[in-house]
Every structure is written in structure tokens, then in C-alpha cells.
Amino acid sequence: MKVLFLHGLESKPGGTKAIALKEAGYEVLNPALPKKPFDIAVKIAQDVINYEKPSVIVGSSRGGAVAMAVDPKGADLVLIAPAWKKYGVSKKIESAFILHSESDDIVPFKDTQELFRNNRGLQVISCNDDHRMRKEETLNAIIDCVNSCSV
């Protein structure tokens, strides 16, 4: 199954979460997203979606905002500490898994709570981690969410 992984602002392709997904057996599409401008990152992601047709889109931090800004073309969403508010992305999404930590020092957990209040199709998973979301149990939770999407 194809999974599009959209990395965060200070990350790059081939990071911990993308590697974990690949090791779990997924075909991981992991394009390099520029730091600026945001709309170019969205265009790159949309082009990959249009051409590769991934089944699941996983976005981390800024990549989560990018994932919320694209037309997923039927792909399921898994958002990791999505920085939607910082990038002015719409608060309306039909359904998604969101993994976030109340200890996040970059993207406030209250932003995820606000998303949940406005979108009842969301499943929020609170992780005992920091913003980087690299602990083994967090990586396993991300993989579990992607596995749930593939059912």
C-alpha cells in the first residue's frame, strides 16, 4: 500500500517516522517539501497525490497542515501534531486520526482539541512524547493508525 509521508518544517525525507513506515512494509512516498512558501509545499504534495494515488497521507507538524490543505482524492489522513493553525489551514476535515502529545513544545495540544470540537469524524490519540514524536510506542501508534486505514 502506498503511503505519502509529509515531513515537518525542520525535517527532511528519510526521517524516523518515514523509515518506521517503510520498515512496517509500506511503500512510502516522501517528497522534499520546501520551508517556504507554504503553497509550493502544498502543490508538491498535491502533484504526488494526483500521480501516485496513495491510500494514506501521513503528515507531521507542518506536513500535517499540508495534508489538511490538499485534496486527498479519497486517501485517509493520519496527522501527527498538525500545525494547521500556524499555517491558516481550514479547521474542517471529514475524518482523520490525529496523534498529539500534551507535552508538545511546538504545536499546542489545544489546537488539536479545537480541531476535535469542530470535526466529529476525528479520532485523537494522545501520546506520551514530545513534538518530535519519535518514541517507539508513538511510532507503533502511527503504524497502527495507518494499518486501521488499510482495512
Regions found by a protein language model. Give the residues of each.
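Active-site catalytic motif of lipid deacylating hydrolases and related acyltransferases
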Residues: 1-52
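Conserved alpha/beta-hydrolase "acid-adjacent" motif
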Residues: 14, 105-114, 134
